[in-house]
Amino acid sequence: MPVSTSLHQDGSQERPVSLTSTTSSSGSSCDSRSAMEEPSSSEAPAKNGAGSLRSRHLPNSNNNSSSWLNVKGPLSPFNSRAAAGPAHHKLSYLGRVVREIVETERMYVQDLRSIVEDYLLKIIDTPGLLKPEQVSALFGNIENIYALNSQLLRDLDSCNSDPVAVASCFVERSQEFDIYTQYCNNYPNSVAALTECMRDKQQAKFFRDRQELLQHSLPLGSYLLKPVQRILKYHLLLQEIAKHFDEEEDGFEVVEDAIDTMTCVAWYINDMKRRHEHAVRLQEIQSLLINWKGPDLTTYGELVLEGTFRVHRVRNERTFFLFDKTLLITKKRGDHFVYKGNIPCSSLMLIESTRDSLCFTVTHYKHSKQQYSIQAKTVEEKRNWTHHIKRLILENHHATIPQKAKEAILEMDSYYPNRYRCSPERLKKAWSSQDEVSTNVRQGRRQSEPTKHLLRQLNEKARAAGMKGKGRRESESSRSSRRPSGRSPTSTEKRMSFESISSLPEVEPDPEAGSEQEVFSAVEGPSAEETPSDTESPEVLETQLDAHQGLLGMDPPGDMVDFVAAESTEDLKALSSEEEEEMGGAAQEPESLLPPSVLDQASVIAERFVSSFSRRSSVAQEDSKSSGFGSPRLVSRSSSVLSLEGSEKGLARHGSATDSLSCQLSPEVDISVGVATEDSPSVNGMEPPSPGCPVEPDRSSCKKKESALSTRDRLLLDKIKSYYENAEHHDAGFSVRRRESLSYIPKGLVRNSISRFNSLPRPDPEPVPPVGSKRQVGSRPTSWALFELPGPSQAVKGDPPPISDAEFRPSSEIVKIWEGMESSGGSPGKGPGQGQANGFDLHEPLFILEEHELGAITEESATASPESSSPTEGRSPAHLARELKELVKELSSSTQGELVAPLHPRIVQLSHVMDSHVSERVKNKVYQLARQYSLRIKSNKPVMARPPLQWEKVAPERDGKSPTVPCLQEEAGEPLGGKGKRKPVLSLFDYEQLMAQEHSPPKPSSAGEMSPQRFFFNPSAVSQRTTSPGGRPSARSPLSPTETFSWPDVRELCSKYASRDEARRAGGGRPRGPPVNRSHSVPENMVEPPLSGRVGRCRSLSTKRGRGGGEAAQSPGPLPQSKPDGGETLYVTADLTLEDNRRVIVMEKGPLPSPTAGLEESSGQGPSSPVALLGQVQDFQQSAECQPKEEGSRDPADPSQQGRVRNLREKFQALNSVG
């Protein structure tokens, strides 16, 4: 395809590289359908003049202005402006660039109209030709793109060639470019659908006839590619404006912001496309993998690299797949991969060889035999692999490594390209393991490099302002000079500025660069021209892209007839360029959809946005998102979960930007927007738009969109919309399939990456300005929000909900709320159902902000710290906690988007007084909680039985509260005394000692004590965490099952048998002993025995044997009684070992036996026999059935006790029969 005609130059002014003929407009250039007639008469002298020519010598030469005059007449309401305006030679350089932007946009809109009117509507009007699903897959949401760009063209036409107004048009509509993401996601489906159509004779004939009738030299596939190419070029077009715009003039910041915005859009689309390719490749690897016994590969995160290497001492080559969480080693066998091993990145160790520059070794640091000495093909390939392996080792390390330390380690690596140094990819990767680490410890330190980078940029601007004579070239060179010396020279060459390239003399084209490679390969060209060789360097491609193609790519020769096969194969090659290079063992970094320089610029922009985007802005955006505004009316009917939501792109920069929001803004948001726009001449550091761009703050987005489209366009869009709605009416699943075709990217990797984007820490919050004050300069919510991807809660059902505004609180508030929760948790009478004290659900993730750093420690139930529940704690923190709880409730109940009033002076004073005392203890508490939770997850060791003489009383009484889970096991993961010893279980001798200490006067029972207590029998192999004396609620390990066995309530049985003994003694005249009391001095609140009288007790000690066996428990036999006056003692009536090695011991109090009887009991022939046991249990049951309920405050479900006793008897019968 030829480039546009070359124009002469005016004096010393240099003619820019022509932007008229572009990839996006080449179709219309060849199709005789443009509404604009180029002033060719003024160009004729230039072709024969002596000026510097920029014409391109390419095979296709039919793309001059004389061959594409209007044939069908005007097709757009905007074509009346086509020939308007002065000739090119009368315009300044900047004016010509602006004109080029407007005219290329006009031709692009004509191409879109051709797709919608000449293809899509004709298919709709031809019933039976294609099914609605095929139509949706083929065209995607092209009608929405046509509507958006028609409005954008209308805005550009009204700018009167004002560059600031042109730039502001892109800023205002940046929220609506998310529909391009949907289109790009659907583009592979479009290629597949068109290929399938061309296999059908009737459908292929229809498309050929339409092409011939419309006199299009290019097929439909070329037109469907144009939106993908166009959206990736806007930022390059705007860069031409910035290069020739005076930095000191008003509106330069608007131009810069437009560049940033459209670069972010391009980067976002490129990143989503790359993820889609990797996800498809990941599924392909999964299907080709043999002998893999592990989980689905999507659980290991994103596919980072793949390659085939020679391995030392291995005959055949090995293919390595590097994922975010593991390194997979396979052997290629035909088209399949045979699994040979894998090393988790958390256990991966890298050894770089100093002798051989191509070799490096990866090994499992715990298993040295699992070692692979890899030989790369090139030094660049080795550096690429070792760099990413180092990064993943740091990110997956069990310890929390500060972000600055990670960056310092990676910067020491010789391979640390600028693309990764300041790119959004690094921001995402920096927290790739936050989902795992956040449950153990707080998040890493806030990254501060973006701020330094922004300061460097400001200093650079100051230097450029002081040296105006040297122009932009010096600024570009100074920017390049900031690159580290250790980086490869190719990365520096990638940053070659456009101006330095465009100032070169006429450059002969490279025959292999006939089409643009790094954006999307054109679908018709031969593969030799479409795919560059592996040895071709990126800077050569970029030079060709800038110097030869004039910022925009070009189509291949138009005489290619056989386009179907090329489209189905070459496009897919273009979509998987990274995989092709990696499989081929390419030395360079995998290609992307954008040139390296574009990604470098996008990375710089990302860093600037992170430093300037405040936490307050992010909260306001979340509020606005929850209020539901920001979705354009003409966006696709099935909005993409991966699209750039308008509400996430921040507030508008000036008054006209509120047009797209005012339809659905809530009153509160309207107030906040008014404060930001009405009282300040510039918002976020931006100057107001030039008068050349009309500002209409009173018109809603709906009215504006309706007026921007002509009646004919509205009829077209309504017809297409009704077609899809009718299809949805006949097929309920059509809407779901259409939405998936527009927005679906396989889960696995993209889901993890999106959650990482959402877990990015917010920068330091700015002070809340009072009403009427100016907004802080430097905040750029509109453009930064392009990086905020939708959360996993939107993409996948069942994921945790997004972080709400109420959780963004300073650390002091969270600390005091914790103290209030702990104090209320330790108070008597608190039932187990009060899990949502202070408005916090204890089973929801707990978000902790440490010095404005968002960290999350998630447990299955909140675990309080022992320090906070100690009885020596003063009243002041609790009082402050109550005050701050009220404050938090007040803040959380405030309306969205409303500015919060200043805090009460007393609260502020208390906060300052207590913050210094609490901060250190809070940090220790956080670390302790993290360690405990980590130990609980990692520890699978059983509880060791304690020797009889080692029992210690470890805690005082618990405010009279009876235990909720009186199981005699402590958690296996809790160390004793800080030395790693396990807390042992209670032995029989200990039980005797504890009961000997029980003698206290009667004490009225509280409501909590009157309620029956349940014994939980946990049959799992993992120990159950019990309630500690400090008042910590029980939290089972995530590994333990939840099924339990409810034992009878001992207190119920005690009271019933005590009443029976009382009646018996009343009949026999025996004196009564003191009443039964509850112990408050032992850890597990064991019951005390009476001094006299017969009180039957039945308690089970469910013990888990340690690794050395559970032989520490004593053998069955009578226990010596500490109070022999009553003539009674305790007997072990049953001692059974269950199938899961748990030991059940049943003890009963009885009369003191004779020595002979004692010998019989010790040998197992006395009352401990099964017959005696059954008789005693039956006696218990009969007595329980005869006794009525004692107190109404107790659990009314007394009949259930009978069933429990009966079940207990049947269980013992079954166990004895088995034994």
Curated annotation (Swiss-Prot):
Ranges where the record places region Disordered: 1-66, 431-599, 613-708, 756-780, 821-840, 859-878, 955-1133, 1146-1207
Domain PH: 296-394
Subcellular localization, as worded in the UniProt entry: Cytoplasm, Cytoskeleton
Any GO MF annotation of the entry: small GTPase binding
Biased composition (Basic and acidic residues): 446-463, 696-708, 1049-1065, 1187-1197
Sites bearing Phosphoserine, chain numbering: 76, 433, 576-577, 618, 631, 640, 643, 647, 741, 779, 827, 962, 1011, 1023, 1037, 1040, 1081
GO cellular component labels: cytoskeleton; cytosol
Regions of compositional bias (Low complexity) in chain numbering: 18-46, 630-645, 859-873
Start and end residues of each DH domain: 93-272
Keywords assigned: Cytoplasm, Cytoskeleton, Methylation, Phosphoprotein
Amino acid composition bias (Gly residues), ranges on this chain: 826-836
Principal location listed in the UniProt entry: cytoplasm
Omega-N-methylarginine: residues carrying this PTM: R1107
Superkingdom, natural source: Eukaryota
GO terms under biological process: regulation of cell migration; regulation of establishment of cell polarity; regulation of small GTPase mediated signal transduction
Biased composition (Polar residues): 1-10, 431-442, 1020-1029
A Pfam family assignment: SOS1_NGEF_PH
Function, as annotated: Plays a role in controlling cell polarity and cell motility by selectively binding newly polymerized actin and activating RAC1 and CDC42 to enhance local actin polymerization.
Protein name: Pleckstrin homology domain-containing family G member 3
Organism the protein comes from: Homo sapiens
Gene (UniProt): PLEKHG3
